[in-house]
Curated annotation (Swiss-Prot):
<feature type="transit peptide" description="Mitochondrion">
    <location>
        <begin position="1"/>
        <end position="11"/>
    </location>
</feature>
<dbReference type="GO" id="GO:0042407">
    <property type="term" value="P:cristae formation"/>
</dbReference>
<feature type="transmembrane region" description="Helical">
    <location>
        <begin position="140"/>
        <end position="160"/>
    </location>
</feature>
<keyword id="KW-0175">Coiled coil</keyword>
<feature type="compositionally biased region" description="Pro residues">
    <location>
        <begin position="110"/>
        <end position="131"/>
    </location>
</feature>
<keyword id="KW-0809">Transit peptide</keyword>
<feature type="compositionally biased region" description="Polar residues">
    <location>
        <begin position="93"/>
        <end position="109"/>
    </location>
</feature>
<dbReference type="InterPro" id="IPR019133">
    <property type="entry name" value="MIC60"/>
</dbReference>
<dbReference type="Pfam" id="PF09731">
    <property type="entry name" value="Mitofilin"/>
</dbReference>
<feature type="compositionally biased region" description="Polar residues">
    <location>
        <begin position="61"/>
        <end position="74"/>
    </location>
</feature>
<dbReference type="GO" id="GO:0061617">
    <property type="term" value="C:MICOS complex"/>
</dbReference>
<keyword id="KW-0472">Membrane</keyword>
<keyword id="KW-0496">Mitochondrion</keyword>
<feature type="topological domain" description="Mitochondrial matrix">
    <location>
        <begin position="12"/>
        <end position="139"/>
    </location>
</feature>
<keyword id="KW-1133">Transmembrane helix</keyword>
<comment type="similarity">
    <text>Belongs to the MICOS complex subunit Mic60 family.</text>
</comment>
<comment type="subunit">
    <text>Component of the mitochondrial contact site and cristae organizing system (MICOS) complex.</text>
</comment>
Amino acid sequence: MLRNSIAPSRGLGSLARQRLTTSGRNLITKRSYIEGKSAAWPSGRSIASVLPARKTSCATFTTSATRGNEQNIRSPPSPSSASAISPEGISRPASSSPAGQTSPGSSVNPPEPPKAQTGAPPPPPPPPPAPKAKGRFGRSLLYLVLTAGVAYAGGVWFSLRSDNFHDFFTEYVPYGEEAVLYFEELDFRRRFPNATRHINTRPAAPRDEGEKVTIPSKSGVSWKVAENEGTSDVTHKGRHMSAVDAEVFRTGGDAKSASNKPTTEDKKGSEKTGSKKDESKERVPVTDTKKSTVSLDEPRKPAVATVSSIEPLAALQDDPIIQELTKIVNGLIAVINADESASKLAAPIAKAKDDFLKLGEQISSIKKEAHIAAQEEIKNAHKEFERSATELVRRIDEVRSEEAAEYREEFETEREKLANSYQEKIKTEVERANAVAEQRLRNELVEQAIQLNRKFLSDVDTLVEKERQGRFSKLSELSAQVAELEKLTAGWNEVIGANLTTQQLQVAVDAVHSALESESMPRPFINELLAVKSLAGQDPIVNAAISSINPTAYQRGIPSTAQIIDRFRRVANEVRKASLLPEDAGVASHATSYLMSKVMFKKEASSSGDDVESILTRTEKLLEQGNLDDAAREMNALRGWSKLLSKDWLADVRRVLEVRQALEVCFLFLLPTLSLLIYYNEY
């Protein structure tokens, strides 16, 4: 991997060196051309003023390159030289100009021309020429072509390996199918070099076409064969057109002479037959020229000699080839039967049929013999296979038993070797552990000795320090007592400030309590809460407790305990009136409940019972004891109209409980300060 990563960097380095050398040579050639042209100019200052820095750098590069590579190559002249100099690479001739070089070239830059002769400073050097884009474009095109070629070759290679990619590549990539087929053909020729050779060098067997058979025109199978032989076509001339011809044919006379003398009755019969095409097509045979036509019911006599048709071959076998041959022969027989000269070919066709039947029987017998021979060969092959399989199983068992014995011996040998090696390792580990334990004990003893020495030295130092500080012990005690007095003074100041704040806060809380309990009617206590909040400062507990109070409570006031009990008694009477009402009660139910409440007896306080009377009794008892929280819980257990009637009373009790809880939290905030005062008082 390291070699592969270094190779591209080396190639890039060599390419950079080549490009640098080429650019240097191009610059040297241009400079030589400019210096050759400068001989015709009036002065050499224009060249130096146009390209001073560029020529100097080129001269330096060229001089160092020529001095390092060739000693016989002349160094380039300075920019102030006015002589025409040939390009680099030509051997140095003798200088003939008065201003030529008298010493060999060196790497030192030539002196610049004196600036006193010029009236203005030289212009700044021109910017370097832009790099040519031609080389970059050509390189990019070359890389693109190489990449496309590699990708195309990779696609062809992968198409030969993968069927899915083969389908994609041959369908969508131009000329992909031709390339893949070409490489597949090369691979086929490489694997089978003699395949095409046998095909090309195989001599063509002579084709046995047999005797040439000529079939006359208008012969073969036709739709006319299926027509009724007893019918006649009145549109064509023939023997059916004249009864004389039929009679002559029967008597053996000349048909031609008889047909040339038609009778009047024949003409009338032909006209009648041609005019009435829908009638029967049976022609009426005539026995004599002077007699009238015979009736249609009389059977027709044949005009020509009857030709016996050749029977087609029956299907011999189920073999498709023989059946195809049978169809061909039957087709030939049908063609012959359609011809008028079928009687002439009856004997050869019959002989051919016999030969064909014999051939079919021979093929059947050959097939049977081949089938029997194949069955025998299959049986022999089965027997040979069974024998070979038995022999193979026996050999496999023998080899397996031998390998098992060898493996067992090797296993025992390896087990003994492993046991011996583990015994040696255990022995070595035990010896090492013993040595490490002994060394550890020695190290612990040395550490204990060092610790004892350190402890002894520290004890000595402690005693010396105690003796040294004995004189200053009383001074240290006095300074400590003074510091304690200062702390006590600062603490008393804090206690006094906290005491004042606590007293003020206690007064504010008591003012809130008195405002809640002393008034006969509810009144707002916003000022008292503001005083408590201002005295508490930024304490989060007190602020949270005051924020938890419902604004309606301190804006309108809350009832006192006596007012809550008095209102409960009025609400209880109304609840008793509606205690017997269901949830969906009407006017009649309200009236009935009102009348029944007049005769109901009031229960005493009981510890159990979920009826309305029991809940009201327990609530009244709790209110007399001052337990508003439990009383509110009892009233909250009501359902239906009873709970609806006591909803306002529960809201007032809830506001009272919220205010009391907030005041209790404020009182708990005062407890740490009170305990601190008690502590300092005891101290």
